[in-house]
């Protein structure tokens, strides 16, 4: 399962914002700004093909009438403002995975870019700041690839890191020559980040109609006007696609996909995604498409694991399993006496937070707040174990949809309600 996730093609739906100083630098020529951005994205795709990741430019915003945040040379402050703007404004206007601010302001000191580390899909953190620091498109694109690398869990390369004797993308200092390779350290950090965090937003395939950059035959992504795209002719390894035209060969129905075999659609009814659990449903090919249908699951609220839980979005969340995940296989759910701490609303024991204030659980809701576990057999003394994280307030809390009583489950407000009501 882990290897399957790592091998799956990833897609980053990217929005690039050009600030008002960019507008002035290019004398209000929005076409020139867009052309530069398109060129940068083409280079990004060349670089990130090493990770089987496609960068889909789904939005370009040019602040022609003035900046929408306070853009200043202090890179940390500007990135903070931009992240907040993305979270509160841009995401409400347009769904996307990552946003980069391209500025013509001279950032502080030698800085030409800044980004949060390991933050892909985070509403504020999936952002970067790029200075338009070089006449060459490719040099700005490499800086963007570097900052995007931070978002994807990569740190700066140390002396022990290498990518074949040349400076690498994640080098701490900018080289004067274009570099296109990630180091062995970057690869390890990126895979570890994906395994540990599984950022959820980078698996869906963007709609062709959402992409704003001109179609490029040879970038491994099927865009408007193309039937297939297997890369440049010298690199194409797909017998179903004409790499020079990005059209299917005569007689071919498809290029690839879970329901495509030898250039033809698999027959209707061919299983393409097995059921992961009793709460999941197996999917089968339609005979009319190369793609496996959208992942579906049993109805929410259906009893599962011998009535220990109720199905929720394809899983069967129960307290014991959540204890195993947090504290290891020997951990089990704690007695009710531990969960009574949630009624106090002190420390990390509560049901929810409102405006930074912890709200204690009502008696009926104690098993929907902080999760408490115990290790090994329970003797005369009970040691209630729990965990929490400042970075992610949901870590250590009981999962949504968990059974909290007969015919009752935890809803999104951390209340224990009738199983027929929260869905």
UniProtKB/Swiss-Prot annotation:
A motif (D/ECD-tripeptide) lies at residues 278-280. Monomer. It is found in: Secreted. Disulfide bonds join 121-201, 161-185, 163-168, 217-246, 228-241, 230-236, 240-263, 254-260, 259-285, 272-292, 279-311, 304-316, 323-373, 338-384, 351-361, 368-410, 404-416. GO terms for biological process: apoptotic process; proteolysis. Residues 10-206 form the Peptidase M12B domain. GO terms for cellular component: extracellular region; plasma membrane. Ca(2+) 1 binds at residues 13, 97, 201, 204. Expressed by the venom gland. This is Zinc metalloproteinase-disintegrin-like batroxstatin-1.
């Amino acid at each position: 399962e882990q290897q399957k996730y790592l091998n799956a093609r990833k897609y980053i739906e990217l929005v690039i914002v050009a600030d008002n100083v960019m507008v002035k630098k290019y004398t209000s020529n929005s076409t020139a700004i867009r052309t530069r951005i398109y060129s940068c994205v083409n280079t990004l795709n060349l670089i990130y093909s090493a990770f089987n990741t496609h960068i889909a430019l789904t939005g370009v915003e040019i602040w022609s009438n003035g900046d929408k945040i306070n853009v200043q040379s202090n890179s940390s402050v500007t990135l903070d403002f931009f992240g907040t703007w993305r979270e509160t404004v841009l995401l409400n206007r347009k769904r996307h995975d990552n946003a980069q601010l391209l500025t013509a302001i001279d950032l502080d000191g030698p800085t030409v870019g800044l980004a949060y580390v390991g933050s892909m899909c985070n509403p504020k953190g999936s952002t970067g700041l790029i200075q338009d620091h070089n006449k060459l498109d490719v040099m700005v694109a490499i800086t963007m690839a570097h900052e995007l690398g931070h978002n994807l869990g990569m740190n700066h390369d140390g002396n022990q890191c290498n990518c074949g004797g040349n400076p690498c993308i994640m080098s701490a200092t900018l080289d004067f020559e274009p570099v296109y390779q990630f180091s062995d350290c970057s690869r390890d950090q990126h895979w570890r980040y994906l395994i540990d965090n599984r950022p959820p937003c980078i698996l869906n395939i963007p709609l062709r109609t959402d992409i704003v950059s001109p179609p490029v035959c040879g970038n491994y992504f099927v865009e408007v006007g193309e039937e297939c795209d297997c890369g440049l002719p010298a690199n194409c390894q797909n017998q179903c696609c004409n790499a020079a035209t990005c059209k299917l060969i005569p007689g071919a129905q498809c290029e690839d996909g879970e329901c495509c075999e030898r250039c033809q659609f698999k027959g209707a009814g061919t299983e393409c995604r097995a059921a992961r659990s009793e709460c999941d449903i197996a999917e089968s090919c339609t005979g009319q498409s190369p793609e496996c249908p959208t992942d579906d699951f049993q109805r929410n609220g259906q009893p599962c694991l011998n009535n220990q839980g109720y199905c929720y979005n394809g899983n069967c969340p129960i307290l014991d399993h959540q204890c195993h995940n947090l504290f290891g296989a020997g951990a089990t759910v704690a007695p009710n006496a531990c969960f009574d701490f949630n009624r106090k609303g002190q420390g990390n024991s509560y049901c929810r937070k409102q405006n930074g204030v912890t709200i204690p659980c009502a008696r009926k809701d104690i098993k929907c707040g902080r999760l408490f576990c115990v290790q090994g057999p329970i003797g005369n003394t009970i040691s209630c174990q729990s965990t929490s994280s400042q970075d992610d307030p949901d870590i250590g809390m009981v999962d949504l949809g968990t059974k909290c009583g007969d015919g009752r489950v935890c809803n999104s407000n951390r209340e224990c309600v009738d199983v027929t009501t929260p869905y």
